[in-house]
Amino acid sequence: MITAIFINVGRGPIVDEKGLAKALKKEKIGAAGLDVLEVEPMDPENPLCKLSESDRLLITPHIAWAAVEARTRLLQEVYKNLKAFQKGEKRNVCTG
C-alpha cells in the first residue's frame, strides 16, 4: 500500500476531486485531508461523498484558518500592516 498523504488547505479548485476519489479507491495514495473543496458546501454528487465512510479521507469545513496559531499570526500581520501604513511604508507587496 502506498502511504503518501495528500493535504489541501489552500484552494479547492486546484484539486481534481474525481481523480482524488479514484486514487483513494484504488489505493494509489494512502490518505487525503481536505479543508477546502471545489464547491462549498459539498455537493452530494461529489465523488468524495461516496468515500465518507473511509478511514483514509478527512474533510473539514474550511476551518484551517481557525487554529489559535493562525489567528494569532493574522492579528500580528494586521498590526504590522497598519503600523507600516501609518509610516507610509509598504509591506507584503506582490508584483506580477
What are these regions (language model features)?
Residues M1:
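Helix-to-beta-strand junctions that scaffold the AdoMet/dcAdoMet cofactor pocket
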Residues I5, V9-G96:
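Rossmann-like dinucleotide-binding domain for NAD(H)/NADP(H)
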